[in-house]
Swiss-Prot record:
Reversibly transfers an adenylyl group from ATP to 4'-phosphopantetheine, yielding dephospho-CoA (dPCoA) and pyrophosphate. GO terms for biological process: coenzyme A biosynthetic process. It comes from the Bacteria. This is Phosphopantetheine adenylyltransferase. It comes from Thermodesulfovibrio yellowstonii (strain ATCC 51303 / DSM 11347 / YP87).
């Protein structure tokens, strides 16, 4: 039986921290699905879902046993459809843990058979978030060491002044 993990997020945009989690999750699961959320009730993404999928697909094209798919609605419904055994989440700090623990409990309540696997980022990415990347790029700072080259270029174009 193939053990499939799902790494969900908006990935707006994907960062080197996300890539770190993806590569490490692939060591645990037979297959990993990067599940790109179509939309979020929290905020409007700066990149379309198609752009976000493209960025992820391009930066992970050399990784085996990885799929990039879009989902909309409840994550647990996507998990059931894909017959996945676990949700993969990155934890940077205690504040992440509190929020992620609530999500894990809610997902477990909705689908009793799902597990959540928390992965700590490599130390160099422990501060990194998509929001931080967007803010730095918006104000003209360099995000070269924080995101893949395709994303850096897209951010520069998006925030040209």
């Amino acid at each position: 039986m193939t053990k499939t993990g799902v790494y969900p997020g908006t990935f707006d945009p994907i960062t080197n921290g996300h890539l770190d989690v993806i590569k490490r999750a692939l060591k645990i699961f037979d297959e990993l699905i990067v599940a790109v959320a179509m939309s979020s009730y929290k905020k409007t993404p700066i990149f379309t879902v198609e752009e976000r999928v493209h960025f992820i697909a391009q930066t992970t094209k050399d990784l085996k046993n990885l799929k990039v798919e879009v989902f909309d609605g409840l994550l647990v419904n996507f998990i059931k459809e894909k017959k996945a055994v676990a949700i993969v989440r990155g934890l940077r700090a205690v504040s992440d843990y509190e929020f992620e623990l609530q999500l894990a409990h809610a997902n477990r309540r909705l689908f009793r058979d799902i597990e959540t696997v928390f992965l700590m980022p490599s130390e160099e990415y422990s501060f990194l978030s998509s929001s931080l990347v967007k803010e730095i790029a918006y104000f003209g700072g360099s995000v070269k060491s924080l995101v893949p080259p395709i994303v850096e270029k897209a951010l520069r174009n998006k925030f040209k002044k």
